[in-house]
Design a protein with these regions (language model features):
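Short beta-strand-centered aromatic/proline hotspots
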Residues: 20-30
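Short, solvent-exposed secondary-structure boundary/capping segments
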Residues: 30-40
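Intrinsically disordered, low-complexity, charged/polar segments
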Residues: 42-99
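Short, well-ordered loop/turn sites that connect or cap secondary structure elements
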Residues: 4-7
């Protein structure tokens, strides 16, 4: 598959070392760890096909954890404009964290 940048919401993926598919429900996510430090994730998702079950069952993950893409989510001009901004934000966040 030839796709660059963030996948759109609705994309269904399988993560490495996993047997349950996830549907992407958000991008550019931050989580605060027990140490109080923020950690950045590319995506948040819910199990597929069940969908949202509870706040405790949202899964944070990064693009490098994706093993297989089953379906790419819906895209239109609005989502493509958002993707462009989100891709730029991810690059900026990663550059700051590496620098």
């Amino acid at each position: 598959m030839n796709f660059s940048g963030l996948f759109p919401i609705g994309t269904v993926v399988l993560l490495k070392d996993s047997t349950k598919r996830l549907m992407i429900t958000g991008v550019c996510q931050f989580s605060v760890g027990e140490d109080g430090n923020q950690k950045f994730y590319d995506y948040v998702g819910v199990v597929f096909p069940e969908g949202y079950l509870s706040a405790d069952e949202n899964y944070l993950f990064n693009a490098d954890q994706i093993e297989k893409v089953f379906c790419i989510g819906y895209q239109d001009s609005e989502s493509l404009a958002f993707k462009e901004k989100a891709d730029a934000a991810v690059e900026e966040i990663r550059a700051k964290s590496e620098g």
